[in-house]
Amino acid sequence: EDFKRGNDIDRYQTVFAKHPGAVAAPTAGLHFSDSLLAELKAMQVYVEYITLHVGAGTFKPIADSVEDHKLESEQFYISKETADVINKAKENGSRIFAVGTTSLRALESAALKGADSGTGSGTGTGAGTGTGYNTVRAVDGESTSLYVQPGHEFLIVDSLITNFHLARSSLLVLVASFADRESILKAYNEAVERRYRFFSYGDAMLIL
């Protein structure tokens, strides 16, 4: 039993983890190895890292209605260097891929909407930035309780890599909001039929 627990500690960790503080790993990141990251970089894919300390509330089932569900606050960090790379990509019309729902929530929490003026609120629905494109601001340990549900306007993230999630979870609501409900239902039905693995150590999907 101790051997299994020790092995799990190694397996339940991304190769790029640096800062302690989360109660769970960003499981979409478990699919990435050092060699895969090196291969992506060799293909001139920009790989940037952000931090969001996942709290236990993320996994709290939706008890009543989707609309009334609340998320607990979680601390997150986006360096100025990373924000600059993302903003340059947005300016150039490049696509931003988020690895995991935690990354998406952090980026959308720090999003500033491109418009004529203003500084933005950093909640995903900010005022204008003075640019013709959406941007993300640097964040140093602020908290977010952003709950992504149908109707959310995605300002930064264009594509998402994510695992298959539990029913009645805020994570599944986020995924269905990012794609659309019918597409996600179809994907999950196919995953069940083909016996894909679900949850933390499971398979992942790419939503373009």
Predicted regions and their residues:
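Compositionally biased low-complexity segments enriched in histidine and/or tyrosine
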Residues: G124-G130
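Surface-exposed, charge/polar-rich loops and edge strands
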Residues: E1-G118, G130-L208
